[in-house]
């Protein structure tokens, strides 16, 4: 037997309340529900309850956070993932404190895109001077990521210096 839906949830009054909410407000409310704390910063959960914070998914979602005016949250998420930058990689997934899964060929590129979107929205580049937990500025972390991608990462991801195409072995 399917669970019974309480009558109060399907009453005319319940629907009227939802009908008066714009689609934009509904989407912004839904967007905010995926942003969660991770330590002293923030992240995006890819999907409850099965998925945690996946680098690529999170960084793609940042475009919506920036456009939706969730800039402090977007900044905290960027700093979170940039703090894990290492030899051209960022985590594909963070599981608790474990960020060893780095088999993502384009999450780093989405991090660059998120930084660009945020700087454009803020009208300047001062955000790039913020300190990341790894002791570098965000700009230094981005430069390190780019250099690591061009040199080739420990898991075989590399950018061709002539075409700038990303190569990734199957993971």
Predicted features along the sequence, with ranges:
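Acidic, mature catalytic/reactive cores of soluble proteins
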Residues: 1-171
């Amino acid at each position: 037997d399917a669970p019974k839906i309480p009558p109060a949830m399907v009453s005319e009054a319940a629907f009227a309340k939802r009908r008066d909410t714009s689609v934009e407000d509904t989407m912004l409310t839904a967007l905010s529900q995926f942003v969660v704390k991770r330590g002293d910063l923030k992240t995006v959960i890819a999907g409850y309850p099965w998925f945690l914070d996946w680098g690529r998914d999170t960084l793609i979602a940042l475009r919506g956070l920036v456009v939706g005016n969730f800039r402090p949250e977007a900044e905290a998420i960027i700093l979170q993932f940039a703090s894990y930058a290492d030899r051209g990689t960022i985590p594909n997934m963070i599981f608790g404190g474990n960020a060893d899964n780095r088999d993502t060929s384009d999450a780093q590129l989405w991090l660059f895109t998120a930084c660009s979107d945020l700087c454009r929205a803020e009208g300047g580049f001062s955000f790039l001077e913020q300190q990341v937990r790894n002791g570098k500025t965000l700009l230094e972390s981005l430069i390190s990521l780019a250099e690591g991608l061009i040199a080739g990462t420990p898991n075989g991801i590399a950018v061709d210096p002539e075409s700038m195409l990303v190569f990734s072995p199957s993971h």
